[in-house]
Amino acid sequence: MEFNANRVDEANAVITATLTKDSIENNLEKVAKQAAKTMNVQGFRKGKVPVAVVKQRYADKLREDAEADGIRKILADGLKLLDIKNSDLIGEPSVTKFDKKDNGDIEVELSVACKPNIDLGDYKSLVPAVKAIEIDIKKIDDRLTEIAQSSAPLEKIARKRAVKDGDFAVIDFEGFVDGVAFDGGKAEKYPLQIGSGSFIPGFEEQVIGMKYEEQKDITVKFPESYQAKDLAGKEAVFKVTLHEIQERAKPELNDEFAQKMLPGQKDVTIDTLRDRVKEQMLAEDKAKYYRDELKPVFLETLVEKINFALPTSVIEQEINYALNNKIRTMTEEEINELKENANKVEDIRNELKEDAVNSVKATFIIDALAKAENVQVSDQEVTQVLYFEAMQMGQNPQDVIKQYQQAGYLPAIKMSMIEEKVISKLLDEKLGK
């Protein structure tokens, strides 16, 4: 059997071999004998089925298995020759050539992707300059006022007037599609905050200007993406009655309010709450500063300065992913043009390649940085983040986590969390110097 194994670079290898007809036939004989031991065939006792019968009935499947055994041996021999461990592989090696010859031989080529060897060098010198975050006292007081207003009780307005933006309009409503009332479209004495965007687009705007006890027909159209499929995209008429207008009571920023917001803590004053809000705002602003300003600069510098070989197959996967996303945004006419012209597809792939290379390179660098900095993210941490986000969106956390698991998104989420964690650690160190 002709055989050749070469390292293209540290991250890629190619193994070529000729799988001879004789070796395939020998493998086929072994596979057939093994199958005969366990196969149930009518007219024969289990384990006593003649090999010739097995070959006759399952010829195609047995030949596929025999060829696969040959490929596995080629791979094993190639990896051994190149001193590549299975733990060094990225994904499954791909069969890039499988050429059946007239004489029964098969010319095989296998492409192997390996974990790259990354020398980070003095990576901490590449961390960008970090400035300390400061919060204006007025912004802190504005946030305190927002918190107080959101928790203040609703009160009926002292003087009757028309509804304006920001009001809580207490309304009765009932919705109809094609003159027929639909489930979930009716409520009484419902406090709708105007401008909250909690109702169907266009509804709240038409409540503005209504007066006490006024009745009005409001016409809106359900979004195409509306969760109730029987209503999605349809026009609806809501019969609305305004009963009263409410607004938040004017909050008092005092020690009593602070004690309500920080229950169970001793000696709480409004200054205690102000300090707590300041800490939260500093953390929020720092996270935004790191994410939006410093992280892109840092990643760009890392990708530019740290060089190493990249696995070709991983880059191709990234290009395929980007290409599929791009196709989803195309019109039917544009997609048909691509189907008719393979060169256009290749042109797009070439356009996407640079970003794909940088993305793959950044991922490997982050992984290496995480190991160097001993940064880890547990499965429990991933679950906690998803749980919290689901609760914020009013969704069932268990359902959301299950959906992410089934879609195979958890590894990507973990990698994203590792990235944020290791970059924040390095930026914090820079800030502290």
From Swiss-Prot:
Catalysed conversion reaction: [protein]-peptidylproline (omega=180) = [protein]-peptidylproline (omega=0)
Major location (coarse): cytoplasm
Entry EC number(s): 5.2.1.8
GO CC list: cytoplasm
GO BP: 'de novo' cotranslational protein folding; cell division; chaperone-mediated protein folding; protein transport; protein unfolding
Enzyme class, UniProt record, top EC level: isomerase
One Pfam family recorded for the sequence: Trigger_N
UniProt GO molecular function: peptidyl-prolyl cis-trans isomerase activity; protein folding chaperone; ribosome binding
InterPro entries: PPIase_dom_sf (IPR046357), PPIase_FKBP_dom (IPR001179), Trig_fac (IPR005215), Trigger_fac_C (IPR008880), Trigger_fac_C_sf (IPR037041), Trigger_fac_ribosome-bd_bac (IPR008881), Trigger_fac_ribosome-bd_sf (IPR036611), Trigger_fact/SurA_dom_sf (IPR027304)
Subcellular location: Cytoplasm
Residue ranges of domain PPIase FKBP-type in the record: 166-251
UniProtKB keywords: Cell cycle, Cell division, Chaperone, Cytoplasm, Isomerase, Rotamase
Domain-level remarks: Consists of 3 domains; the N-terminus binds the ribosome, the middle domain has PPIase activity, while the C-terminus has intrinsic chaperone activity on its own.
Function: Involved in protein export. Acts as a chaperone by maintaining the newly synthesized protein in an open conformation. Functions as a peptidyl-prolyl cis-trans isomerase.
Family note: Belongs to the FKBP-type PPIase family. Tig subfamily.
Protein name, entry field: Trigger factor
Organism: Aliarcobacter butzleri (strain RM4018) (Arcobacter butzleri)
